[in-house]
Amino acid sequence: MNAIRRLYALTVWLSTLLSAAVAAAVQASAAPALPEQLHDTGLFAPGQPDMLGAGVEAFEPQHPLWSDGASKRRWIRLPPGTAIDARDPDRWRFPHGTKLWKEFSHGRPVETRYLELGADGQWRFATYVWSADGRTARLAPAGGLTLSVEGAPAGRYVVPSRDDCLACHTGARSPVLGVGALQLGQDLPRWMREGRLRDAPPAWRERAPVLAGVTEAERAARGYLHANCGHCHHGAGGVPVPLVLAQDVAGNAAPAPAQLHEALRRMSTREPTQQMPPLSTRIPDPHGQALLRAWLDQVPVSSIR
């Protein structure tokens, strides 16, 4: 059984690395240079680092990604006169020129990650590292780096390489994680009314879709798995493993109890060949573990195979 588990982990790891390598080669081909400083990406108003740039809006996903206890803030900007194509409710298509930012903090801002959809239809990924005084943020090396940060696990903070960013984002249903019908909650009806979405179900104007589930514990666990595992385990490409943890608007995805136990086991370890997610986390998430245990406590023993 241990040999099978290690083969499974190796398959996932190699698939992730291959996806990142291919995507990195595509991104590097004739791509314009990334801005050297965060303020040149448009997040802030010109000359006013305490004010958001024109058209930039904050948002908060209902089910956030675990990031080793870091606090996060997120923003999005759509080009004027454009809207997100939501005709496929689970695979939104963003207009060229879309920009997104995510700030990671441990008592102070440490890094801000940046996504931009170019005119060529290719997503570009970058990370900006903040100065200790929080006044400026500069482009990090493409290979990433490790910082000494008070409050981070063991005082060390790993800024991901661009290949690491690509490994998670390019294997997902959409390269944009955390922005979708099941994540925006009550922001979704507002976005509909403001014209930020097109070709979306009219019912979203009044009410956002909810995760499937009989109990609140089940819905909470599904949401956690969707946000933390579903970008790879979605059954439409991603990793070549028969495990679907992404949820969809129709509520079709339902992992078997035995799969839930395996997901919990991998969430609870940081052994390199076993841990899930395989990247960007060095300590398990106690809240996520508690959510899965609460759901499993409600599953009849007879259904666990």
Segments predicted by a language model, with ranges:
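Bacterial N-terminal signal peptides
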Residues: A9-A23
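Short, well-ordered loop/turn sites that connect or cap secondary structure elements
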Residues: F94-G97
